[in-house]
Amino acid sequence: MNRLKERYNTEVTENLVKKFNYSSVMEVPKIEKIVVNMGVGDAVQNSKVLDNAVEELELITGQKPLVTKAKKSVATFRLREGMPIGAKVTLRGERMYEFLDKLIAVSLPRVRDFQGVSKTAFDGRGNYTLGIKEQLIFPEIDYDKVSKVRGMDIVIVTTANTDEEARELLTNFGMPFRK
């Protein structure tokens, strides 16, 4: 069993039940899924760029990404409806906990001038969004093989009803929030 999942079952549920006075252990919020999205605007001119992004995302998450397509045509960007412009991965279960563990323990501390992640990036429904400026913070990415530095969005979807519950859940998992 994964380290974070084990921690959730032993410590985290206990701490949250004490703090929020839940009547049942089933009320305790948990992480439902993690969505990693990489928008590749350059893919409009050069489709090889998207292949590199898909490959990198697969290395980072350990799962084959879904290629996202444009919903609308935008003439200014020379974009047609249905053109591939990004990639996303939805992680659940074991892979989700492995990715979160790697993100918290290895990747985030590798960010330059890292002070902690923002406390205000919750959406009001208990979900947390995190933007990463470069894919090089992940240990799987080889610096020499990277053609272009790309960022990505990471959305952590929880079953928490409020932002406060979600913040407490992620803090118990060891998410380094800014002081």
From Swiss-Prot:
GO terms for cellular component: ribonucleoprotein complex; ribosome. The keyword tRNA-binding applies. GO terms for molecular function: rRNA binding; structural constituent of ribosome; tRNA binding. Keywords: Ribonucleoprotein, Ribosomal protein, RNA-binding, rRNA-binding, tRNA-binding. InterPro entries: Ribosomal_uL5, Ribosomal_uL5_bac-type, Ribosomal_uL5_C, Ribosomal_uL5_CS, Ribosomal_uL5_dom_sf, Ribosomal_uL5_N. It holds the Pfam family Ribosomal_L5_C. Transmembrane segments: none annotated. The keyword Ribosomal protein applies. Signal peptide: none annotated. Gene3D superfamilies: 3.30.1440.10. One of its GO terms (biological process) is translation. This is one of the proteins that bind and probably mediate the attachment of the 5S RNA into the large ribosomal subunit, where it forms part of the central protuberance. In the 70S ribosome it contacts protein S13 of the 30S subunit (bridge B1b), connecting the 2 subunits; this bridge is implicated in subunit movement. Contacts the P site tRNA; the 5S rRNA and some of its associated proteins might help stabilize positioning of ribosome-bound tRNAs. Part of the 50S ribosomal subunit; part of the 5S rRNA/L5/L18/L25 subcomplex. Contacts the 5S rRNA and the P site tRNA. Forms a bridge to the 30S subunit in the 70S ribosome. Belongs to the universal ribosomal protein uL5 family. PANTHER family: 60S RIBOSOMAL PROTEIN L11-RELATED (PTHR11994). This is Large ribosomal subunit protein uL5. It comes from Staphylococcus haemolyticus (strain JCSC1435).
